[in-house]
Amino acid sequence: MRIDTSALCDIYSDQVDVVEPIFSSFGGASSFYGKITTVKCFESNGLIASVLEEEGQGRVLLIDGGGAVRRALIDAELAQLALDNGWEGIIVYGAVRQLDVLETLDIGIHALAPIPVGADDNEIGEVDTPVNFGGVTFFPEDYVYADLTGIILSPELLDLAELEE
């Protein structure tokens, strides 16, 4: 289903938080939504790879990379792993790389910027902890909705049937 964050903001203005417009879309899917799983790490993506090995149906991986853009936390291999395991999308408060491949994959990917340098593969960081960036606090189990216009957050699953009316 196509997500329209503008319409969702109009319908659920009292229920959603809007993430500051600091992200760009790099994946092949223009919109996505799901229940958040958070990873907090810095310039290392080993923990990200471990989480992406899990079943991702109905889930979005939200990565707090501290806003660092010196090393890419998501590359083509990790994006393909996410797609293979059914993840709906990935949001990276950090950088990504291999854009020519990312844009061909049917998964939503939002990040701050691209850079060709890869991350370390250490499994250092935290999983399912609250993270704060873009003017909002993301809690594990919250729901995130993203499209080319922006990213919004809700503590509850929104009724997307409202978009069709």
Curated annotation (Swiss-Prot):
Instruction: Report what the protein is called.
Output: Regulator of ribonuclease activity A
Q: What does this protein do?
A: Globally modulates RNA abundance by binding to RNase E (Rne) and regulating its endonucleolytic activity. Can modulate Rne action in a substrate-dependent manner by altering the composition of the degradosome. Modulates RNA-binding and helicase activities of the degradosome.
Q: Which SUPFAM superfamilies match?
A: RraA-like (SSF89562)
Q: Could you describe the subunit structure of this protein?
A: Homotrimer. Binds to both RNA-binding sites in the C-terminal region of Rne and to RhlB.
Subcellular localization is given as: Cytoplasm
Q: Name one Pfam family in it.
A: RraA-like
Q: What is its main location?
A: cytoplasm
Q: Name one GO biological process term.
A: regulation of RNA metabolic process
Give an example GO cellular component term for this record.
cytoplasm
Which keywords does this chain's UniProt record carry?
Answer: Cytoplasm
Keyword Cytoplasm assigned: yes
Q: Where are the transmembrane segments?
A: none
Q: Which organism is it from?
A: Actinobacillus pleuropneumoniae serotype 5b (strain L20)
Q: Which GO terms describe its molecular function?
A: endoribonuclease inhibitor activity; enzyme binding
